[in-house]
Amino acid sequence: DCIRAEHTVTMIAPKIGLYSADGPEYAGDLICGNLYDRLDEVIDDVDHAAEIVEPGDLVDYFAPLPTNIDKYSRGSVLIVAGSAQYPGAAIMAAKSAARAGAGYVAVAAPDACANLIRMALPSIPVFAIPSDSRGSFGAAARMTVCEIAKKYSCVLCGPGMTTSAGAMQVVSGLLELDVPL
């Protein structure tokens, strides 16, 4: 057990543990106290184990988008994922691809969970692929998924698929394609 602080005062510099693992959950608002007026002069020469990166630090890494850009010029991603047991994996993968900047995202999932994924992702197309009796990709899934995958810039495959025979056939088929996986 650990005390959940509303505020934590750390001296000289922020500590890694306050920003990683369970640290943020227990630390509360962080305040960095200064023990030495010219500390910046001293620690500028020291190698740091880590740096705190805030959203504003990343702005220069992303070029402004042209005004005439469309969704297909930012790449298309097919998410081959999910099963009746793990539909959330496909949902999270599709949301992540869209948030990361993919121009067009679609999901190919077993028909046993396709409607659930459609309800969670109304703006993302979902292909319902034949499933087996356990709600994973069925024996007929390989050819269907591979035909769909050929139309995309890249494929994300795996989250929540389980290790059924049909799922393994889908993965084998995708590995044979000339599409980044």
Predicted segment positions?
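Small-residue (G/A/S/T)-rich helix-start motifs and N-terminal tracts that mark the onset
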Residues: 5-7, 13-181
